[in-house]
Amino acid sequence: MARPPPLLVQKPSFLVEACCSPSPATHLAPYHTQPGARTPSTIQRDLLFPIPRRCHARSSPRPPALGGGPTQRLQHAARSAHPIPPSVKEIHPTFSEIPRARASDCCAAALGVQHWPARHPHPPLPSISLAVDYYLLGQRWWFGLTLFFVVLGSLSVQVFSFRWFVHDFSTEDSATTTASTCQQPGADCKTVVSSGSAAGEGEARPSTPQRQASNASKSNIAATNSGSNSNGATRTSGKHRSASCSFCIWLLQSLIHILQLGQVWRYLHTIYLGIRSRQSGESSRWRFYWKMVYEYADVSMLHLLATFLESAPQLVLQLCIIVQTHSLQALQGFTAAASLVSLAWALASYQKALRDSRDDKKPISYMAVIIQFCWHFFTIAARVITFALFASVFQLYFGIFIVLHWCIMTFWIVHCETEFCITKWEEIVFDMVVGIIYIFSWFNVKEGRTRCRLFIYYFVILLENTALSALWYLYKAPQIADAFAIPALCVVFSSFLTGVVFMLMYYAFFHPNGPRFGQSPSCACDDPATAFSMPPEVATSTLRSISNNRSVASDRDQKFAERDGCVPVFQVRPTAPPTPSSRPPRIEESVIKIDLFRNRYPAWERHVLDRSLRKAILAFECSPSPPRLQYKDDALIQERLEYETTL
C-alpha cells in the first residue's frame, strides 16, 4: 500500500513533537527549518497543539517518582520564553493571559515551611522530645523505636530528594549540551525520534521503556531550547555550565541533604519561583509558574513519603504505649494528633499538587481537598487505633501481620505495572515504599478507572480491622473493662464508616471530572478529540496547504522510506466491513494502523501518543469524528479505553 501524504505541511517536525514517540524505529519527519527559527505559523502550531510532556514522572500516574526525575520543566520554560503574538491572541483568547503563581499556591508553600518542624521529619521536634523523655525515664526500648522511625523517615526522604536532584541536573546538562551543539553553524540538527541518547544517537538502546520515554523527552527539550535562545533568561540557562559552577552546585546540594534540609530547601525554592512568577514580565512568567508548580509537586511527594515512613509508625507506636500504660501524657497526645493530621493532609495536598502540575487534568478545588482530608483522616484513624489495640496484646503477631500485609500490597502494586522510575530496580524500590502507604491508607498508583481496586482495598481493610479488633476484645488484659473496650470498638467502626461516607461524597459531588458513579465504562468520558475544534482561519489555510503540497510531500515520503529501509510506521486504510456484534453501530471512520507495539511504552506515553495522533489527524483532515487507533496488540481494547477516560 502506498504511503499516504504526510499530515505536516509547514513544519514537518510537528508530528515528532506532538506524538512524542520514543520508538527506535520511528523516523517520522526531520527538521527542514533553521534551528531556532520561529514564524507566526510555528508559534500558532505550538500554542494550538502544545507539546505533550510526560507530566509528573513522580506522580501517580506521573510522577511521578524515585529515579524518573521530575517532569521536564524546561520544555514549557523554553517555549514560553517568547511572548504570545497578537494574531494568536485573537484566534485563541485563552492564551492571551499567561498564568501567574496564585497567592494561594505561594501561601501553601509558605505554610509548608512554617509548619515544617511540626509536620515534617527533618527533624520533628515532638518526636525527638518524646524520645528524650523515654530515655530519661529508662524506657530504652520505646526510646529506640521512636528514634528509629525519626531517622528512617529523614534519611529515606533525603536519599530520594538527592536522587531527584541528580537526575534533574544531569537531564538539564544533557539538554543544554544538545541545544548548544545544534546552534553551531553547519551542525546537522535533524530531529529523528529514537531511543538513543538525548543527542540522538541511535546506537544506544535503553533497557526499559521508561528510559526510552525519558530520553525522548530530553530530545524534545533540546529542540525547544534551541528555538528560544533569543530570550535572556533562557539563553543564560541554555549555556553549558562550567566545571567550577557544577562543582559548587553539587557541593551545596550535598551539604543541604547531609544536614537533612532537602525538603526545606525545596519549599524555599518553591516560594522563590512563585515570587518570581508574580514579579516577572509576560515573557518569562509562564516559565517560572510551571517550574513552581512542578517543584511543589516534587516536595509534596517527598512530604507524602516522609509522612508514611515516620509519622504513621510513630502514631501506631504512641497509641500502643498509651493503651499499655493506661496513661496519656500531653506530649504523647500532641505527637499522635500531629502525626494523624499529617498523614491525612499529606495525601490530600499531594493530590492537589499533582493535578495542578498536569495540564491534562482538571484542578481540584479546595473544598474537594477538605473532603479528601476528612476521608483519609477518619479511615487512617480507624486503622491506627485498630493497630494500637491489637499490638498492645499481640506484639509478635502484629509484626507478622504488618510484614504479610506489606508483602501482599507490594505484589499487588507490582502487578499493576506502575511506571514511575527509570530502571526496573528503582521501580521495585518505589513499589516497596508505596506498599508501606497501603498498610494505612489508599493511594492510587495507576491511571484509569479505580472503582474496582478501591472497593477491593477497602473491603480487605474492613475485614482486617474487624478481625484485629475482635481478637483484641477476646484476649484483652483483665484490667481493661468493657467500659473502655466497647467505646474503643465503636470509635474504630464509626470512624471507618465516616471516612467511607466522605469518600463517597468526594466521588459523587466534588470530583473534578464530575460525579463518578452511575457511569458505564463505555461512556464514562468522551474522547477529547471530539471536542477539539480549529479556528476557521487555521482550518482554511491548512486545507489549502495540504492540497498544494500533495506531490512534494509524497516524493519526500518515498525518499524517507527508501532511506529508512523499513515499512512505513503509519498507514491509513478504510474501515473493514462491520461484523455482527453486540456493540452499537459506529460512525463511518478511518482506521490508522500503527506498526508499533503499544505496550512497550509507559502508560502515560501511550496515552499521550493516542491523544496527540487524534488531535493532529482531526485538525489537518477536518474529519467530523475522531479516527480510531489500531495497534498490533489491539486485543486489549479495554486497556486503551481505560486511559481514554482519564482526561
UniProtKB/Swiss-Prot annotation:
GO terms for cellular component: plasma membrane. Residues 207-236 have a biased composition (Polar residues). Residues 193-238 are annotated as: Disordered. It is a multi-pass membrane protein. The keyword Transmembrane applies. Pfam families: XK-related. Phospholipid scramblase activity is activated upon caspase cleavage to generate the XK-related protein 4, processed form. Does not act prior the onset of apoptosis. The chain crosses the membrane at residues 142-162, 245-265, 328-348, 362-382, 393-415, 425-445, 454-474, 484-504. GO terms for biological process: apoptotic process involved in development; engulfment of apoptotic cell; phosphatidylserine exposure on apoptotic cell surface. The keyword Metal-binding does not apply. It is found in: Cell membrane. The record marks 564-565 as: Cleavage. The modification Phosphoserine is found at residue 197. It comes from the Eukaryota. Belongs to the XK family. This is XK-related protein 4. It comes from Rattus norvegicus. The gene is Xkr4.
